[in-house]
Amino acid sequence: MRGYLLAIFLSAVFLYYVLHCILWRTNDYGVTPMEMKQRNKIRSCLSKPAFASLLRYHQFHPFLCAANFKNTASFYGSDKFDLPYGMKASATHFRLALWKLPNCDIFDEFDNVPCKKCVVVGNGGILKNKTLGEKIDSYDVIIRMNNGPVLGHEEEVGRRTTFRLFYPESVFSDPNHNDPNTTVILTAFKPLDLKWLWELLTGGKISPNGFWKEPALNLIYKPYQIRILDPYITRMAAYELLHFPKVFPKNQKPKHPTTGIIAITLAFHICHEVHLAGFKYNFSDLKSPLHYYGNATMSLMSENEYHNVTAEQLFLKDIIEKNFVTDLTQE
């Protein structure tokens, strides 16, 4: 009889939890939409940013939240596009991954600095020997991407990282590269990217099948450090900033924005002033360094079929000439 009553009690507790999650749409960590809204309100500035004319939404929250991601997708039209530009046919993958993340905050709740001045640090070889590290570290927000290292390159690129965009094939797997003060942002290009994150968060086994190169097989970041980028940011980069066609000819591979352009688009939505470093490439010398680290050369960039580097360089030239951004490595 005692066991029977215990079973009824446990069932009631479980049912209460399920109903609570449904009614309040919380994630696994019990965060409600109202609490999310309070946390993620970006402090507005009295003046408009220089790049304001590029933005359709001036109070857009760039990270997905478990509590309301479906409503967000519907409101911004992301339910009509497949990845990497929307959530169509991938909502289940988003839900599973998001429910394992404790929050979707942009900045720390105690961060009261308004009108943030940001720098987006590319991985370009032009950063070699520039000694911009101290300058980069002086910004309110420092955005980096992929596996561009800080360790061993502090003089060139600084020590601090606020945000780092990544995808499964580009994320660090060496714990020496983990800064507990960094927020890492998954930029999902395919449903498998979300499945990869969910598997790592739940202790599952990762299969390399379906990735263009082997993804990280372990996660050096804690769940509280991880966010998932709203696909609207990638879609805006592709269609509104780079003006890519929605349908490519059959004889062409579809082009997608590089992580660098996506990072700049993110900066436009969370910063008041945006500076760039490391986005200039030397196409006249294919043997020149592609990155400020490693031995890769510009020849690899010229062989890339998935990005339109010419369109990206024209876009960068345009926003620099219009003083929408400042380029720290302009020569």
Swiss-Prot record:
The lineage of its organism: Eukaryota, Metazoa, Chordata, Craniata, Vertebrata. Transfers the sialyl residue from CMP-N-acetyl-beta-neuraminate to the terminal galactose residue on sugar chains of glycoproteins and glycolipids. It's alpha-2,3-sialyltransferase activity is specific toward type II glycan chains (Galbeta1-4GlcNAc) on glycoproteins and glycolipids such as neolactosides nLc4Cer and nLc6Cer, whose sialyl-products serve as precursors for the Lewis X antigen. Critically involved in the synthesis of functional selectin ligands needed for neutrophil recruitment during inflammation and lymphocyte homing to the lymph nodes. Gene3D superfamilies: Glycosyl transferase family 29. Keywords: Glycoprotein, Glycosyltransferase, Golgi apparatus, Membrane, Signal-anchor, Transferase, Transmembrane, Transmembrane helix. It holds the Pfam family Glyco_transf_29. PANTHER family: SIALYLTRANSFERASE, TYPE 2 LACTOSAMINE ALPHA-2,3-SIALYLTRANSFERASE. The gene is ST3GAL6. It is found in: Golgi apparatus membrane. This is Type 2 lactosamine alpha-2,3-sialyltransferase.
